[in-house]
Amino acid sequence: MNKFEKSLRFIREKISSDSPFYGKIFLVGGCVRDELLGERYSDLDLLIDMPDGQKKFVEWMCASFPEHCKGPFYYQRYGTTAMDIIIDQTTTLVECVEPHIETYADDGVSLLETRFCTLEEDAQRRDYTCNALYKNLSTGQIIDPTGRGIDDLKHGLLRTPAEPNQIYRQDPVRMLRGIRFKHQKGFRLDDAAWQAILQQHDEMRLSSPKRLRDELNKMLKARTFGEGINDLYISGLLAYVIPGLSDYLGDADQHPRCEPGVSLWQHTRTALSVLCHEHPHTEPLMKLTVLVLDIADIHGEDAAKQILANAQIGKERTISILHLVQMYKRFRSFYRNREYVGRPRALSHFIVALGQKKDDFRRMVRALNHQLRYENQLPFQVFYDEDFVPKERHQHDRRTGRRSKAEGSSAPSRSTSPSPTPEQLEQIKKERNHRRNLKRREQRKRKRQADRNRGADTAD
């Protein structure tokens, strides 16, 4: 039970049958949707079905249970009243509203006023039918005022309760949220909703950068993040979410290291799809690294840095991503035509420098290998064994080179030895373990002999 579920249980226990709020409090929006999908709550929004109910309820909770409820906090512009519920030393923000209708100016964006209404009218102003569901906290009954919300949820359909252009004009971020739901929840957008997004995408310029950043951070957790970025690019929303990125995705030129006909965005999109499909819980940091790596490789790190700055992901994450980009370039410099050309022990030192990021880096390298020409693919298998053979081979090459020079002949080229196969790597690992065991056995034998000699000297 997470903090939202604990807070909801606390509220439910405090609303007795003789309370004026009994039967008037509804769980609303994404909370009901996630519950029906069998997922945990990620926020807590309540609707109080009475005029000024949000103020009355929060004020009553804070006055009646001051040790657990802190507030109230008023947000006059949106007609919202909130409170902090503290349970087990964990604080949860609970936002409360009344069912209301919003009146906008002629531009469809400027909010003029809000007024109390019925649940049916309140449902018509919400973004999608699957989010226009209400659960009565007292009875547990789920109400579907649009008559389509539960059915659309079962079929994974994102449809607006009212005319899509009107819904998106009131809050343009709803367009971005629809694409996020599509790739985060596995839903599909209604055709009318998608056409409205194509028509209304310029309205996104009116949205605050903070809300756009929050939606991007949520989309980074999607299993089909690469396809989500592609949908944002096609719809025109990407220009507002990550300004500048569209300029590079629209470049149809051949990627210099890829197979014929593969552009920069085709390679990046494929790598993201492979990474998210094979490892659904990949860290957002690695996804962002793959997103800008080809751009940094072809157009320079300054271009990638500018895109990350436009995405407002934070200075620390930007530094980490650029560091991973540099590490990838360094790893690639160890190989030429799939042959190791680095200095002795350089690869071992590189793997140690990766630290806990080694597995994530290996997965990224493997994903980026897709659609690269064979000679440009990098051996991600080396990250399975830190005592990789190039170190030993180069030590042998150096000894051979010195011997060859003494005999008046030139040293063999480093690039003449092929990269080892996975079977050879496994054999090398077994031989290494065998040598280590022999060494330890010999050390124990010498220690026992020393102990016996010490005991004999004491007896004398």
Identify the role of each PLM range:
Residues 1-460:
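Catalytic cores of the polymerase beta-like nucleotidyltransferase superfamily
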